[in-house]
């Protein structure tokens, strides 16, 4: 049994906008100790300069001074293969934010197999969307339909296939830029895949979850809506998310979800 007074030894994978926000939130939490940060080699010096000697900043799992009790990934899809898989194999429980990558079934299998091999637990964070607990509970009784509708301001879709569908810089009315499965949405819009993939994995799966993505000049924030029905009844939840102050492209709720995961790990009473 864990000593109630010993802080949980944590490794953070990634130190971008989300990682930095999470670190600031828990830096002085007596129940947690972020003792390790894993970032790409070219970022190590900058992160060491920001965090000082109290944190072990390395570029690989092999370089860690010791095995952490818990790891939090907020680094992007590549980090799942490079860092989360070996940590799980070594027996470290991990929570991951890059859920969109799990539309690749081979990667999901690799993570699951690594967790089995190490006797570790892999937690998928809810990230920028709410209602995941209700959706996952409803699945136990059977779900007939799950739909996700995602709206962004037109310029939020720059750099995606939406640019070939409409003039994102001169839109006067909303336009649907994608309709299909969550798996196809994740493949075509990888930078916007985390919410759709999270909903799919909590509910009826990547192929049965229907996704509609909309460029909407009437909205100023990213708007997420889940519609589901099944043996439990019906649900409809809509969220209009604010970004992190330090990064307008990153959902604040994604960072809060990661903070919650860390604090839940250190708590003996979890909701």
Swiss-Prot record:
Residues reported in the UniProt entry to bind NAD(+): 128, 194
Role noted for this protein: Specifically catalyzes the NAD or NADP-dependent dehydrogenation of L-aspartate to iminoaspartate.
Gene Ontology biological process terms in this record: NAD biosynthetic process
Matches recorded under Pfam families: Asp_DH_C, NAD_binding_3
EC number of the protein: 1.4.1.21
GO molecular function, one term: aspartate dehydrogenase activity
Organism: Burkholderia pseudomallei (strain 1710b)
Protein name (database record): L-aspartate dehydrogenase
Superkingdom field: Bacteria
EC class of the enzyme, as a word: oxidoreductase
Record's miscellaneous remark: The iminoaspartate product is unstable in aqueous solution and can decompose to oxaloacetate and ammonia.
Family statement: Belongs to the L-aspartate dehydrogenase family.
Active site location: 224
Keywords: NAD, NADP, Oxidoreductase, Pyridine nucleotide biosynthesis
Reaction equations catalysed: L-aspartate + NADP(+) + H2O = oxaloacetate + NH4(+) + NADPH + H(+); L-aspartate + NAD(+) + H2O = oxaloacetate + NH4(+) + NADH + H(+)
Record-linked SUPFAM superfamilies: Glyceraldehyde-3-phosphate dehydrogenase-like, C-terminal domain, NAD(P)-binding Rossmann-fold domains
